[in-house]
């Protein structure tokens, strides 16, 4: 369930902290969040797709680690990001 190039580019443009930024925690978390949302929709229709379910759990864990890292280095950036993404309601 990879993102198409256009979607990925729009996410990078929206969450980049500076021009050419593709690796900041904000960009990585935003991309992972979109992949998680897409995979969640897929699993609503295909309930027995356990291979994709495992992939979803891996993505959630990776996003959680990145968010923890961001919270450790700059709590204000962390809070701004979870607000923009609609996480931790």
Curated annotation (Swiss-Prot):
<dbReference type="InterPro" id="IPR005290">
    <property type="entry name" value="Ribosomal_uS15_bac-type"/>
</dbReference>
<comment type="similarity">
    <text>Belongs to the universal ribosomal protein uS15 family.</text>
</comment>
<comment type="subunit">
    <text>Part of the 30S ribosomal subunit. Forms a bridge to the 50S subunit in the 70S ribosome, contacting the 23S rRNA.</text>
</comment>
<dbReference type="GO" id="GO:0022627">
    <property type="term" value="C:cytosolic small ribosomal subunit"/>
</dbReference>
<keyword id="KW-0694">RNA-binding</keyword>
<keyword id="KW-0699">rRNA-binding</keyword>
<dbReference type="GO" id="GO:0019843">
    <property type="term" value="F:rRNA binding"/>
</dbReference>
<dbReference type="InterPro" id="IPR000589">
    <property type="entry name" value="Ribosomal_uS15"/>
</dbReference>
<comment type="function">
    <text>One of the primary rRNA binding proteins, it binds directly to 16S rRNA where it helps nucleate assembly of the platform of the 30S subunit by binding and bridging several RNA helices of the 16S rRNA.</text>
</comment>
<keyword id="KW-0687">Ribonucleoprotein</keyword>
<dbReference type="Pfam" id="PF00312">
    <property type="entry name" value="Ribosomal_S15"/>
</dbReference>
<comment type="function">
    <text>Forms an intersubunit bridge (bridge B4) with the 23S rRNA of the 50S subunit in the ribosome.</text>
</comment>
<dbReference type="GO" id="GO:0003735">
    <property type="term" value="F:structural constituent of ribosome"/>
</dbReference>
<dbReference type="InterPro" id="IPR009068">
    <property type="entry name" value="uS15_NS1_RNA-bd_sf"/>
</dbReference>
<protein>
    <recommendedName>
        <fullName>Small ribosomal subunit protein uS15</fullName>
    </recommendedName>
</protein>
<keyword id="KW-0689">Ribosomal protein</keyword>
<dbReference type="GO" id="GO:0006412">
    <property type="term" value="P:translation"/>
</dbReference>
């Amino acid at each position: 369930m990879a993102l198409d190039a256009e979607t990925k580019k729009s996410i990078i443009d929206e969450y980049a902290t500076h021009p050419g930024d593709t690796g900041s925690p904000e960009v990585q978390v935003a991309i992972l969040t979109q992949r998680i949302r897409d995979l969640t929709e897929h699993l609503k229709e295909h309930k027995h797709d356990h291979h994709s379910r495992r992939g979803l759990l891996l993505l959630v864990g990776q996003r959680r680690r990145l968010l923890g890292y961001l919270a450790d280095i700059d709590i204000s950036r962390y809070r701004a990001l979870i607000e923009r993404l609609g996480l931790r309601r």
